[in-house]
Amino acid sequence: VDRLLGVAGKEDIFIVTNASQTEVMLSQTAGRVRKDHILAEPAARNTAACIGYAAVTIVKKYGDGIMCVVPSDPYIREEAVFQDTLREAVKAAEETDALVTIGIKPSFPSTGYGYIRSVEAEGKPYRRVEEFVEKPDEETAKAYLEAGCYAWNSGMFIWKASTILSYYKKLLPDIYDCLMQLAESFGTPREEEALWEIYPRIPKISVDYGIMERADHVLMLTGDFGWSDVGGWDAFDTLKDRDENQNLTVGKTLLLDSRNCTAYSVDKLIAAVGVSDLIIVQAGEAVLVCPQSEAQRVKEIVEALSEKGENSYL
């Protein structure tokens, strides 16, 4: 929220979160985000649903406007540079009516991010997107880095709210129909009831797969502001150095005869002996253990817990 307050006022910031997190979100953002701008999802339905929910809320309740979709988990080292890049993206969306994204200038051949291939737009600060590509293997990632025309997909998107809804109507009609049903209830006594009735029926698909990979007019601003997607535990390597045994530790930890492990403790002791290549995370009543090579699969655990209604562990 704080990094966005440098670009937008608190009257213009919306947060989409799971309904189980609403009270925590209200407490953490008090005085910085309007209470009625915290939109609670009754169920996790992937990014096309939550972004569409925010877009239809903006259009139906407040009229059209430029919408910036910014995930909450990335670490951004140079916030002033990020804000300048976001302003450029807003300007591009206003002038072109395109879908705009921010691609991160890659600093190493990551296999944990999707990539965006783009070409120059002569005389413009943005580039024209030619293709979104899946997370590559190591050799392909090295080739992308050497090619110079690939960027990491940050998941940040900028567009007119009405423009993105027109793409929902064209490319994701089932989701669009659900959003229109929700919109009909806005401002009525049935608004909350309709949300809980309709939202869980929205098809689960990401906005990347559903729209961005299929849209015909996508532009990209290149971001070079110290971005790291700490939604993945392997990204901690970009934030802190490993010790002489290649272990990375945060919090109360004790690793004996162990190598190449990541141990992160919030408030309890993590102790391990004779292990290697593991990620061990403790937070509250939950403990995560997985091989370093499987770090990108943590989201599968999140999805499984969400489907079982175990949101208290998330």
Question: Which residues fall in each region the model found?
Answer:
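Conserved N-terminal catalytic core of the sugar/cofactor nucleotidyltransferase
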Residues: 1-71, 75-87, 293, 313
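Short coil/turn connectors at secondary-structure junctions
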Residues: 10-11, 34-35, 62-65, 95-99, ...
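A residue-level structural signature of the nucleotidyltransferase/glycosyltransferase Rossmann-like core
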Residues: 14, 67, 156-157, 228, ...
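Short beta-strand segments
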Residues: 16, 68-71, 101-105, 133, ...
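Conserved beta-strand scaffold positions in the cores of enzyme catalytic domains, especially
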Residues: 38, 99-101, 220
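Residue-level signal for inorganic ion chemistry
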Residues: 54, 73, 116, 160, ...
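Conserved core of the sugar-phosphate nucleotidyltransferase
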Residues: 79-198, 292
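Left-handed beta-helix
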Residues: 162-314
